[in-house]
């Protein structure tokens, strides 16, 4: 596994790497350059660095898998309520954990009542819920949420981290996998656990023509986002024995580098993932869209569209 390294002693602060980075992943700070989660390990900066301050280091032998165990579910809240994908993730986590003797954990980040909402997860067989509750988490700021979840991962060392394939989850998961220099498989539709704790992540590829099987064999944790409504919802257990742990939140953790200039609360509209009935229109629908919209309303569903 390759890791991108920076030697501040060799850096001349020429800025060539910043100018050439195609992803805007390098910024200049007082102490030198820093790399953020936009880095794709493409190597452009390494080739541009004349002083050899940036270089790739080959990590030998991979992670010691025995030091990483358990499955961590990111429990997303939507407008103060638990997102339904969380219960699907817990159900899948319990199935995977049973095969290798793991425990199932959850982590929640939010404002007031987050710890109260965490109680909803215990009846579904979660062994421990880690809660990061602070008013500074009001409104989703990807950097702050990533700091909180990364803190949990660093302390817990889970072998697998499952995140819902929502808009929030798709923003959060890549930041986390980059921080831990490990892999991420997005939009999984099926998960399997090997006896050696490698997670087989299955997802459609090439427009759904094939199903790709992806394994992160040399690094931990293993990150995967899972599409909503493709896994079975978790069943409640007879005797819940889990607990809730409220974690300390530092001021740095809630100090965001993102400045919100304005915000507008939109009326909640059901997403197509939540609908039981969909009327789908393609490019050829033309002037029939009004009729299709009326049909969707009569059927109690929603009108949606294919790719252009």
Can you describe what each PLM-predicted range is?
Residues 1-308:
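N-terminal glycine-rich FAD/FM-binding segment characteristic of electron-transfer flavoproteins
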């Amino acid at each position: 596994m390759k890791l991108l390294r920076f030697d501040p002693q060799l850096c001349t602060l020429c800025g060539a790497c910043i100018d050439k980075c195609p992803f805007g992943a390098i910024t200049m700070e007082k102490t030198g350059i820093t790399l953020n989660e936009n880095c794709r390990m493409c190597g452009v900066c390494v080739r541009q660095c004349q002083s050899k301050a940036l270089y790739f280091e080959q990590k030998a032998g991979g992670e010691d898998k025995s030091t990483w165990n358990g499955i961590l579910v990111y429990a997303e809240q939507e407008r103060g309520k638990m997102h339904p994908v969380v219960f699907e993730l817990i159900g899948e986590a319990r199935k995977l954990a049973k095969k290798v003797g793991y425990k199932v954990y959850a982590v929640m980040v939010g404002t007031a009542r987050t710890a109260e909402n965490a109680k909803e997860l215990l009846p579904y067989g979660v062994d421990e819920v880690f809660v990061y509750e602070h008013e500074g988490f009001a409104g989703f700021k990807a950097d702050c949420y990533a700091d909180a979840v990364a803190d949990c991962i660093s302390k817990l060392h889970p072998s697998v981290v499952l995140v819902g394939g929502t808009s929030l989850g798709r923003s959060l998961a890549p930041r986390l996998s980059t921080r831990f220099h490990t892999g991420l498989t997005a939009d999984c539709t099926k998960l399997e656990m090997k006896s050696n704790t490698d997670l087989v992540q299955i997802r459609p590829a090439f427009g759904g023509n094939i199903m790709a099987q992806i394994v992160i064999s040399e690094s931990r944790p293993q990150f995967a986002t899972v599409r909503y409504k493709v896994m079975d919802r978790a069943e409640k257990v007879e005797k819940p024995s889990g607990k809730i742990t409220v974690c300390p939140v530092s001021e740095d953790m809630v100090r965001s580098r993102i400045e919100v200039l304005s915000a507008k609360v939109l009326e909640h509209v059901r997403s197509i993932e939540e609908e039981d009935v969909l009327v789908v229109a393609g490019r050829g629908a033309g002037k029939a869209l009004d009729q299709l919209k009326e049909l969707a309303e009569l059927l109690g569903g929603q009108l949606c569209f294919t790719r252009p």
